Amino acid sequence: MDMIDEAITEVVRKIERERSVIHGALSMKRLTQNQTVHQQLHSNIEESKKSIIYLEERLEKLKLRKNGVRKSNSEKPSVGIEKNPSFSTTKSAKSFSSTSSNIDSNLDLLNYDTPLTISKISFLLQQLEFKLSVEEQYRKGIEKMAKLYEREHDRRSIAEAEKKYVESAQKITLLKQALKRYHDLHIEIDEEDVPSTESRGNLNARRPQSGLLKITVGSLRNVTHSAGISKQTEMIVAIRAEDLERARTRPSRTDRFNETFEIDLEKTNEVEIVVYEKKNEKLLLPVGLLWIRLSDLVEKQRRKKVEQEVSDKGWVSADKMINQRLSIFLPSALNNISKPESTDRPNTASGNQSVSAWFSLEPMGQINLTMNFTKHNTRKRPMDAGLGRQGAIRQRKESVHEVYGHKFLQHQFYQIMRCALCGEFLKNAAGMQCIDCHYTCHKKCYPKVVTKCISKSSDSASSEYEKINHRIPHHFESHTNIGANWCCHCGYILPLGRKTARKCTECGITAHAQCVHLVPDFCGMSMEMANRVISEIRTTKIYKAQQHKQKSSHHKHHHHKKSKSSSSKHKENDKASVSITTTTTPSITPADPVPTSPKPLAIEPVKRKPVHAGNLEVTSVSDNKLGATVQVVEQKVDDKADALTKPPSLDAVKEPIPVPSVETSVVAQDLTHKAKRIGLEDFTFLSVLGKGNFGKVMLAELKSEKQLYAIKVLKKEFILENDEVESTKSEKRVFLVANRERHPFLVNLHSCFQTETRIYFVMDFVSGGDLMLHIQQEQFSRRRAQFYAAEVCLALKYFHDNGIIYRDLKLDNILLSPDGHVKVADYGLCKEDMWHDNTTATFCGTPEFMAPEILLEQQYTRSVDWWAFGVLIYQMLLGQSPFRGEDEEEIFDAILSDEPLYPIHMPRDSVSILQQLLTRDPKKRLGSGPNDAEDVMTHPFFSNINWDDIYHKRTQPPYIPSLNSPTDTKYFDEEFTRELPVLTPVNSILTKEMQQHFEGFSYSCEDDKPSTTDNA
């Protein structure tokens, strides 16, 4: 209560101060006729009025909070504080929140017409604090350069440095004035945490932008002139990008410019607008500053497109639909809105998406700007282009650097980060971040880290870190963060408020509440000092070890020299013996015929390796003695296969043995299962069905059975180069899980084999094409979309029941069988061992289907599949994606911030399931609980579905594809099917070590279990 009373008193005092400013300004206006003075006084009055409005809102909220606590304490003293938040939702609180509800992006916070709010003050304080720290460092650099120029007596450079120093000093003055103003508006009691624009998981912290900026500088108003300037001053506006001036207006005495510039920008973060006052012919003095991040401008333009679309179409969000009770449950409702003409989007791409507004200058004044940014994007796709194919993306694996248990990965940060070791800013550069505890530092600093990671057990920490005797714990207390402060552990900026910020009362460092327990007990000692102590300890240990080694080696040097000489002689004799044996042994003996009835024989490791039929590969060797090319069979070891008898020598070969070409595998007798292995020569390729990053998918006929299969062909070279070996093995294991029950809605595996350059997955051929092709031809009815969703739901349920998450659910990966049922295909992004509450963090998926937690690079569960399932249902029902954009970044922004829109007459159960599946909080998402798919299956959207009939295919499909023959490929892209079904030659030669990565790949579904070579 005392804190609230003190806060109320402080707010009242600030309001009175602002009123005094207004009263004094009005009095001064009556005493002078100077228009420049009038203009300056007018701007002061306007700023004070805005401050009073903000402070009065805060005052009313504090009074309501005080009354709420008193009322709660009088009624129920034990729970009074808990009732406080609910009491604050009164008219005043709602009116206050409404002022900030129209803020779409950070660009709106720079708009002069945006009222002062906690969000706006927080954003500006963080921005100004950072700019001030950078400018102070810049001024120090100028001072150092000026001293160097003085030593060299370079007058021209000295004059230039002095000019820059004066400008920098003036900027620092302006920044301090602006900071003081916003600090004065801060109220200590503010209990609300406002998300920081630079905090972890920030929606707008994106990479630099490249494109064409078209900017029109209109006019200025209420700009404060520097002291001692005459009435006839000239103003100039300069546009800077990445510390370089890119454009400048002509001088103006009327504060009007109306000049348009087109600036080509490459990987630029922000544009700086500097308003100069021309003091003399040589000196321009800055009087107003503004920074606009290009990512904020891009986001604002994207939101304008969405707003235009909403106004033209009349679609609403689920919340508005429920609140306005516009949802009408009619059987024909969805069919009416599902017609193609009802889902046509207005052409927003061609509309004017320029952003025009009065933007606030710091510390005083406004500037009128009109801006439009067009990105240079080769993969640009109009928002209203409808559904289209998109490839999946996967974060490439990087090398892990371990230091004291920390597992550091290189990470590109696109926001302002502070190194946890040296305390300097990363400044949009690559840094190192621990996978487990998120400790963040420079690339140059991570080897110097002295803190132990939480993932490292205490008993294993016998390191120099344990030997630092400085053990003074920090005294962290809850801290009201106001301004720009960074976490001393993870390096992210702290949000405004009290809930998540902690500050040490002794040394003053700040941290997130969740990071406090990770901060080492080095109160009063910097990390750099601790690193110097560690360096001394290491140096001492190394010196002592070297001294001990020198003493021991001095006594044994003579004896060791003799032993080394003797052993080298033996090695030379052994090498000579091996050399003789090698040259006398024919190099083409592997081509000798293999006995049809081998007898078990113990073979030493130095002798010939036993031949296994499933792992024979062919190479071509030229022998000058024979005058011909002999096909050599490369043999691989199978630990469980029986050894073969030694084949006859080369002299016993009377006639050449017919063998397949280099690009085929050798089919021989499986010694364990007595069954013939599948190889490349057993198939006849008929057509190409599709292409991917690593290879092709081809239609082929198995000669012996006259059965059609789809063969996925992957190049070993690309698999190795992209570190996808384990992913390929995992894909095979997922196929085996699907094979276990021959699941009706999963593509099953017939067999897999390999050659020297490729691996092959022989899969079911699903001839009806994918759902993307069908939905592009015609809109799905409600029944058809519901039917496909039910079968896909059972496929996901089977995966989840076996601890597998799919992570690449989309229309492209759902194939339509000739009988009208669907099959889920492409298991390349699946992950195993993902049971309930198990998590992973790999950044992968198809952009439009990726869940928010994946985009935020958080640990996620199998509930990401249910988010993708919601996007899938939305696309099937409405023929468009709920989250759209012209490129990946815009799509990601839409996923993180936009609400899906629905036709006002869409059935209630359809809106309900989409709303519950597309919930951004993964813990509240439908299907995220331990019941998993059962919760989805019991939703009213599936109320008319008999799940047992669906699983056993007893439900009549709503659509049957028309096929002319079993080999008809009309439902596949003609771009691929018209190609010749041949494998392109591969010139690269893989080493034996490379080939070992693919050992045990062969498999056949005819076996009771995977082949004996299958260790994948």
UniProtKB/Swiss-Prot annotation:
Encoding gene (name)? pck2
Classification lineage: Eukaryota, Fungi, Dikarya, Ascomycota, Taphrinomycotina
Per the database record, which ranges form the AGC-kinase C-terminal domain?
A: 943-1013
Q: Which family does it belong to?
A: Belongs to the protein kinase superfamily. AGC Ser/Thr protein kinase family. PKC subfamily.
Keyword Ribonucleoprotein in record: no
Q: What name does the UniProt record give this protein?
A: Protein kinase C-like 2
Chain positions of all zinc fingers (Phorbol-ester/DAG-type): 405-453, 473-523
Record-level Gene Ontology MF annotations: ATP binding; diacylglycerol-dependent serine/threonine kinase activity; lipid binding; protein serine kinase activity; protein serine/threonine kinase activity; zinc ion binding
Q: How does it assemble?
A: Interacts with rho2.
Active site (catalytic residues) = 808
Q: Which organism is it from?
A: Schizosaccharomyces pombe (strain 972 / ATCC 24843) (Fission yeast)
